[in-house]
């Protein structure tokens, strides 16, 4: 905005200008973080997908498992957009946390389901939820409580970081527990 204004006002003069200050530095830092976050997440999704292909030896299973973090990250960014929460130094890291946790939960559930299907395809989904599902849920709730501690801060970005991270962990666990058994058990 300022750059456009000055360009229009000073276009017929010999005056050169340079916009500087902490605001410009902070804006450039956020732009750099945002750009590198997109590149990094793209690389991470491809690398994880390739590892899942090796682990499960099934394109469909790898696709379902990698789909969970995509949904979780999408839901977090949608929530941020709905509530006009800006991307800043704190909130930009939530996508990485979400990907890490949701891949972990998804692998646990998918692997257990695969093992249970070898024993009995009729009870595989139920047995998966009762065994690994409980562990994933308890772990997720523990981590959610840990992140909710940030909501007691006096610093708004820290509060948002805690709340969004907690939501991210909850969504990751919930999506893994609900979608993976129902999708993979029908195949």
Residue ranges of model-derived segments:
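Membrane-embedded transmembrane helical bundles of large multi-pass transporters/channels
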Residues: 7, 11-187
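Well-ordered, non-membrane alpha-helical segments in soluble/globular domains
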Residues: 1-5
């Amino acid at each position: 905005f300022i750059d456009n204004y000055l360009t229009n006002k000073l276009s017929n003069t010999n005056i050169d200008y340079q916009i500087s200050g902490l605001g410009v530095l902070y804006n450039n830092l956020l732009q750099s973080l945002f750009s590198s976050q997109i590149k990094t997440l793209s690389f991470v999704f491809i690398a994880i997908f390739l590892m899942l292909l090796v682990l499960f030896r099934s394109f469909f299973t790898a696709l379902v498992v990698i789909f969970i973090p995509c949904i979780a990250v999408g839901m977090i960014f949608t929530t941020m957009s709905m509530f006009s929460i800006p991307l800043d130094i704190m909130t930009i890291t939530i996508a990485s946390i979400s990907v890490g946790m949701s891949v972990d939960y998804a692998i646990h559930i998918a692997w257990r389901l695969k093992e249970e299907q070898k024993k009995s395809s009729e009870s595989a989904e139920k047995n998966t939820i009762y065994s690994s599902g409980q562990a994933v849920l308890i772990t997720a709730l523990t981590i959610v409580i840990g992140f909710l501690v940030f909501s007691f801060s006096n610093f708004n970005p820290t509060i948002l970081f805690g709340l969004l991270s907690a939501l991210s962990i909850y969504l990751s666990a919930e999506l893994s527990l609900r979608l993976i058994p129902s999708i993979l058990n029908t195949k």
